[in-house]
Amino acid sequence: GFDYASDCRGTQPFMPVWQGEVIHCPQLPTTLPTLDELLGVGGLNEGNVHERLLELTVNAPPTGHIYTLHAELEGMKLLPVFEKLLTGWRAQGYTITTTRAIFASLDKAALPRCEIVRGTLPGRSGTLMLQGNPYLDRWKLAAA
């Protein structure tokens, strides 16, 4: 099996729950929008889209951010944008690392259990999987 997955959107690493069953494969969700979701929205273009992403990373969550890039965009046509992002993230104090290193640093037993749901995001065509609500939290509140 997989040690971990990074194929949904969310706010922090979590243990996914699907239809009431805990899936024992930690999820390291993408926490930031992709360039193709931002370009052309609200006046964002190749010359300024990096500024929007850097605004979103000014304050780092405790587990950091995970950014998904597309080799055919950031590695080719939008390489200058990606270089600006890397420079900006380093200036913000981030260490560029791998999802494997993030996974290795996690206390897996302490990860929140969250539902995984299908949904949509602005700028993204179709549906994708999203980190949902913490599992059973609404029942814990009702019992309190």
List the predicted regions and their residue ranges.
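Structural preference for beta-strand elements that scaffold enzyme active sites
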Residues: 3, 25-27, 64-68
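C-terminal domain-boundary segment and adjacent tail
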Residues: 59-144
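His/Asp/Glu-enriched short active-site or ligand-binding loop at hydrolase and phosphoryl-transfer sites
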Residues: 1-18, 27-39, 93-106
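Alpha-helical scaffold elements lining the catalytic groove of polysaccharide deacetylases
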Residues: 16-61, 80
